Amino acid sequence: MRLLLTTTAAALVLSIVGSAQDPTAAAITKGVQYLTVEVPKWKAGHSCYSCHNNGDAARALLAAGAKGFDIGTSLDDTLAFLKQPAKWAQNKAPDQFDDRTLATIQFAGALAVAERHGKAASTDLEAAAKLLAAAQQADGSWQLDDSHSVGSPAAYSALIATWSARTSLIASGMQPDNFTIVQADRWIRGVTVEHVVDASAMLLALGDAGDVMAENLRRASLSILRTGQAPTGGWGPQAATAPQVFDTALAVLALRSLESEPRLARSAYRPEQLTDAIATGRKYIVSQQRQDGSWPETTRPANHASYAQRISTTGWALLALLQ
């Protein structure tokens, strides 16, 4: 028994030491601790659930919990809300922030992650999928109140919104040949990729599609990301702009999605270059973390204060480090 206890204690010490030596694990732990405090605060202090706290941030905490990080009971209330899509329409945000389509997309995205990890029933996600399908535009996209902007952590561009909605629909069991998905794919292939945010979202939206249009869009997107990464490892919204955390997190997620199939990235990256781009992007994200565990909010224009964007930025940063 004494030997067993000694061995267990030694293993625990090694685990703690190993974590202390791993800046990424330490950053994730701090970020999770920050969000476990912040996520429940919004509903407690307001009359509604929010896209940033109960969408983006909840999604990150669910992913962290699935990786073994302690999220405690921080999502109990959020999950109870997310598992009732029929009541989402009753959730009333302040008028200037009440974008129902954005809320549906964000809540469905968090619910999809919850369902994947056994925290919600498939029937809950199927109900959310019906709301998503109803919000699709005739051209196949999902458009938000601010969809014509570059896109930010808490206010998605049309391409980010469409990718996110499509991902949740596929997670709900909808097949790629379903008309809703076919229309979304057609719209995605008609987008002109002009900046880093679009390039990252495009790579995520295309997945491993091998049609000619997808290959051309992937090639253009990879070229933008390859030339847009700064010496610090980060990306900004445009190739020549200063790096920001959200833009970097989205780029890391996009490149990470190709790492298991490096042939998809060969127009711009050799396998070792792809791995290095992801690693340096993550290092940049870690380097930007604040002492309280949050990340500075990415805003458009830059350097504005926003609690919502700070929470969402922190959620996206965690997702990029967890992948």
Role assignments for model-derived ranges:
Residues 6-15:
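Bacterial N-terminal signal peptides
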Residues 16-20:
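Sec/Tat signal peptide C-region and signal peptidase I cleavage site
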Residues 22-27, 41-71, 88-130, 137-182, ...:
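An alpha-helical repeat/solenoid feature that recognizes helix-turn-helix modules
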Residues 27-34:
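Primary recognition of N-terminal secretory signal peptides and signal-anchoring hydrophobic helices
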Residues 34-41:
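Short, Lys/Arg-rich amphipathic segments at extreme N-termini
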